[in-house]
């Protein structure tokens, strides 16, 4: 049988549906997706919903929405772990038949009494079942669990692509339960059975699962199954180096969508959280697929840096095709529960993207810069901009308006008219631009007056200048 690393790559993302898709889970899914896609492999999605009390359909939907927004498409149908419980139980019984597991009739009370006694005597509290080597003829007619018969000497070695060689002394591991007394499988069994049956070749997951790898390796070996390639990635910490929590800001992937970050920028930034390709900070998803490898993942926790996130997202907005950018803005408005753009607003915005998209790090920032194109008359100036409209400035606007009405409405013609007018009046262009910004946008900081005029058109420009002159 070929080694897992020599077979076509199959990765998987296996979240528990107990809440939203955490940003750490989003990065784990991304790493699995990049590794599979870059090797023309398969990326699978499994929902680990065996905890029926905590698992909810709403959480599953939230996970799927988060992955879809990130652009992480999976292959085949979504697998439900709970739906495979009969298969898990079948494997537990096969382990019994192989002598790799045994029935344990010890009650919870007996196990707790053992541990209390061990603590009192200063002994290890690791439970050693008296039923491990018991003659089956001595088995009582009573409820039992099935425990894996773990080796009690030697060591289990994990060759991890990120963590390196990790050794576990077998004497420190107990005979874990694989099937409960009610016939339901434990997570530790279910995950191995599912990964084997789904043909997973590479298990890429958080390093909080590293200890599980030793026990799961024992299950693989007990069943004579090939052990996958392990890659346990470090967790994400906050900017202060502490475990990521709500006090650090948004935790859910969908929150980032609602805050207006572009999905391509999020993929880029999350890929750089813990993985590197030289000094490259900005790259496309296609480049990431080509470059991504497990050897580039560091062992230390990555720190979330919102300034870097915004910088990367700004670069992605700047290079987006206009049609794609308009689609993403529409999706952002829907996710943030904000009113959709009218046809007129959308037309003006798309017309002005050339002057806006290299100035914004998020969609809200872009839309704020585009307010001049989205607002309807009369334009209400803020306090700072209103100061530029004194009687002299209003007179200038009244005098300028007829000249603009006759313009060809090209940037070159508008620039020539405004420059000549300012020169004729003996004023610097900045002094002319100030009342124009107020009239057109009601703000002191705007795109260039030429860009604003071109975006909103001749009629709207003249109407806004006339409104301001008459105010």
Curated annotation (Swiss-Prot):
<keyword id="KW-0436">Ligase</keyword>
<comment type="function">
    <text>Catalyzes the attachment of glutamate to tRNA(Glu) in a two-step reaction: glutamate is first activated by ATP to form Glu-AMP and then transferred to the acceptor end of tRNA(Glu).</text>
</comment>
<dbReference type="InterPro" id="IPR001412">
    <property type="entry name" value="aa-tRNA-synth_I_CS"/>
</dbReference>
<keyword id="KW-0963">Cytoplasm</keyword>
<dbReference type="InterPro" id="IPR020751">
    <property type="entry name" value="aa-tRNA-synth_I_codon-bd_sub2"/>
</dbReference>
<dbReference type="GO" id="GO:0005524">
    <property type="term" value="F:ATP binding"/>
</dbReference>
<dbReference type="InterPro" id="IPR020058">
    <property type="entry name" value="Glu/Gln-tRNA-synth_Ib_cat-dom"/>
</dbReference>
<comment type="similarity">
    <text>Belongs to the class-I aminoacyl-tRNA synthetase family. Glutamate--tRNA ligase type 1 subfamily.</text>
</comment>
<dbReference type="InterPro" id="IPR014729">
    <property type="entry name" value="Rossmann-like_a/b/a_fold"/>
</dbReference>
<keyword id="KW-0648">Protein biosynthesis</keyword>
<dbReference type="Pfam" id="PF19269">
    <property type="entry name" value="Anticodon_2"/>
</dbReference>
<keyword id="KW-0030">Aminoacyl-tRNA synthetase</keyword>
<dbReference type="InterPro" id="IPR000924">
    <property type="entry name" value="Glu/Gln-tRNA-synth"/>
</dbReference>
<feature type="binding site">
    <location>
        <position position="246"/>
    </location>
    <ligand>
        <name>ATP</name>
    </ligand>
</feature>
<dbReference type="InterPro" id="IPR008925">
    <property type="entry name" value="aa_tRNA-synth_I_cd-bd_sf"/>
</dbReference>
<dbReference type="Pfam" id="PF00749">
    <property type="entry name" value="tRNA-synt_1c"/>
</dbReference>
<feature type="short sequence motif" description="'KMSKS' region">
    <location>
        <begin position="243"/>
        <end position="247"/>
    </location>
</feature>
<keyword id="KW-0067">ATP-binding</keyword>
<feature type="short sequence motif" description="'HIGH' region">
    <location>
        <begin position="15"/>
        <end position="25"/>
    </location>
</feature>
<dbReference type="InterPro" id="IPR033910">
    <property type="entry name" value="GluRS_core"/>
</dbReference>
<dbReference type="GO" id="GO:0005829">
    <property type="term" value="C:cytosol"/>
</dbReference>
<dbReference type="GO" id="GO:0000049">
    <property type="term" value="F:tRNA binding"/>
</dbReference>
<dbReference type="GO" id="GO:0004818">
    <property type="term" value="F:glutamate-tRNA ligase activity"/>
</dbReference>
<dbReference type="InterPro" id="IPR049940">
    <property type="entry name" value="GluQ/Sye"/>
</dbReference>
<keyword id="KW-0547">Nucleotide-binding</keyword>
<dbReference type="GO" id="GO:0006424">
    <property type="term" value="P:glutamyl-tRNA aminoacylation"/>
</dbReference>
<dbReference type="InterPro" id="IPR045462">
    <property type="entry name" value="aa-tRNA-synth_I_cd-bd"/>
</dbReference>
<comment type="subunit">
    <text>Monomer.</text>
</comment>
<dbReference type="InterPro" id="IPR004527">
    <property type="entry name" value="Glu-tRNA-ligase_bac/mito"/>
</dbReference>
<protein>
    <recommendedName>
        <fullName>Glutamate--tRNA ligase 1</fullName>
        <ecNumber>6.1.1.17</ecNumber>
    </recommendedName>
</protein>
<dbReference type="GO" id="GO:0008270">
    <property type="term" value="F:zinc ion binding"/>
</dbReference>
């Amino acid at each position: 049988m070929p080694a897992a690393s020599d077979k076509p790559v199959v990765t998987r993302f296996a979240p528990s549906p107990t809440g939203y898709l955490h940003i750490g889970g989003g990065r784990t899914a991304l790493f699995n997706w990049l590794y599979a896609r870059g090797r023309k492999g398969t990326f699978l999605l499994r929902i680990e919903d065996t905890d029926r009390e905590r698992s909810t359909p709403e959480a599953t939907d939230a996970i799927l929405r988060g992955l879809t927004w990130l652009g992480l498409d999976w292959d085949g149908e979504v697998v439900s772990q709970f739906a495979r419980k009969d298969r898990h139980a079948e494997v537990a019984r096969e382990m019994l038949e192989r002598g790799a597991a045994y029935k344990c009739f010890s009650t919870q009370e007996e196990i707790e009494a053992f541990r209390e006694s061990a603590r009192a005597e200063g002994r290890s509290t690791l439970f050693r079942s008296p039923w491990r080597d018991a003659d089956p003829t001595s088995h009582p007619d009573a409820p039992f669990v099935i425990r894996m018969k773990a080796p009690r000497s030697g060591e289990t070695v994990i060759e991890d692509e990120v963590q390196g060689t990790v050794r576990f002394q077998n004497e420190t591991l107990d005979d874990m339960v694989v099937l409960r007394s009610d016939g339901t499988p434990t997570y530790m069994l279910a995950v191995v059975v599912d990964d084997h049956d789904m043909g997973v070749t590479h298990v890429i997951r958080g390093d909080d699962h590293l200890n599980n790898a030793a026990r799961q390796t024992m299950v693989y070996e007990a069943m004579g199954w090939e052990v996958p390639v392990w890659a346990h990635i470090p967790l994400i910490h906050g900017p202060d180096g502490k475990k990521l929590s709500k006090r650090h800001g948004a935790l859910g992937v969908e929150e980032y969508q609602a805050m207006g970050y572009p999905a391509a920028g999020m993929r880029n930034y999350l890929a750089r959280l813990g993985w590197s390709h030289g000094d490259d900070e900005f790259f496309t998803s296609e480049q990431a697929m080509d470059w991504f490898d497990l050897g580039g993942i560091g062992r230390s926790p990555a720190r979330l840096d919102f300034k870097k996130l915004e910088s990367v997202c700004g670069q992605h907005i700047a290079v987006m095709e206009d049609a794609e950018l308009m689609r993403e803005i529409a999706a952002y408005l829907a996710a943030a529960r904000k009113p959709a753009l009218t046809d007129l607003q959308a037309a003006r915005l798309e017309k002005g993207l050339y002057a806006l998209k290299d100035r914004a790090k998020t969609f809200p920032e872009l839309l704020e810069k585009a307010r001049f194109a989205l607002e309807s008359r009369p334009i209400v100036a803020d306090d700072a901009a209103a100061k530029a409209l004194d009687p002299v400035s209003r007179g200038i606007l009244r005098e300028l308006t007829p000249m603009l009405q006759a313009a060809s409405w090209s940037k070159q013609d508008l620039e020539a008219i405004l420059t000549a007018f300012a020169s004729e009046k003996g004023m610097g262009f900045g002094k002319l631009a100030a009342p124009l910004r107020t009239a057109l946008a009601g703000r002191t900081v705007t795109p260039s007056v030429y860009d604003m005029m071109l975006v909103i058109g001749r009629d709207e420009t003249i109407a806004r200048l006339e409104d301001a002159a008459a105010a």
